[in-house]
C-alpha cells in the first residue's frame, strides 16, 4: 500500500495535529501516543506509550508480552515536568525519545528500559484517520480529537540482551484532550494490518449509546466505516482469544477480518477499568497480517461477569 497512490474519501488532517497540542485546563486533559507492534514469528508483541498532562507532567511506558519471553515486561517511568515549548520534533522524557519527520508520515523513537530497549523508525502506509472527520465528531470525554494510522516499523528490539531486527507492522494512536476512562462501560479498540489493507475501528459503549469510529484502507481507497458485524470467543479468564468481523465502509465495500490472539496481557490505566490487550495474527480478505484488539471493561461488571462467561457468553 502506497501513500502516493491512495485516494482518501475523508478530510485531510492538519499537519499541526501530528505534534504536541496546547491542552485545555479541564479535568483529565492529557495527550498520548501509543505505538503498537507485533513480532509473531518470535511469539512477541508490545507497545511503547508516552503521554503528557495538561500540567506539563510527562511519562513513558513499554510493555512486551508473549510466549517468546521468559516473563512479561511492563516498564514504566514516573512522570516528570517538561517545558511547555518542548514538542514531538524533539521529545526527550525519562528513557524515551521521539522525533517527528514528515507530518503524519514518519516518526523516529527510542525506548531504553532495564529489560527492553527499542530503536524504531515508523513510516505510514496511509493518511491518518481523525475521529473529528466523523459527522458526530470525537466523543468529547475521550479526547478533543484522536488520530489512528498504520505503518511499518524498522529498527531493533532488544529484550534481556536478545537482539531482534524489526521490519513489522505498527499501529499508531495519537489523542489529545479529556480522557475520562470510566465513562466507557465497555469498548473495543481494533486494528488489523496487512501489506494490502488496513482496518481500524473503535466501538464505545457510554451513556446508553454505542458509538463507532473507524476506516478501511484498501484497493487504493481509504473510506470511513459505516457498520461492523463481529463475533469473538473468550478463554477461561474472559479474555478474548478470537475476533472475526465484517466491516462495511462508505464506499460500499465489505471487508472480512479474522483474528487469533497470540499474546495477551492486562494493562492497568485507571482504577475504574481493565484493559484486556490482545496482539493478533489475522487475515484481511484472506491475506495474512497482524494487529491489536483491546477490550475495555468496567471493573465491577467484569469481576461479576467473568464467573458466568463459560455458561452464558
Model-flagged regions — what are they?
Residues 1-313:
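Structured soluble/peripheral alpha/beta segments that form catalytic or ligand/cofactor-binding pockets
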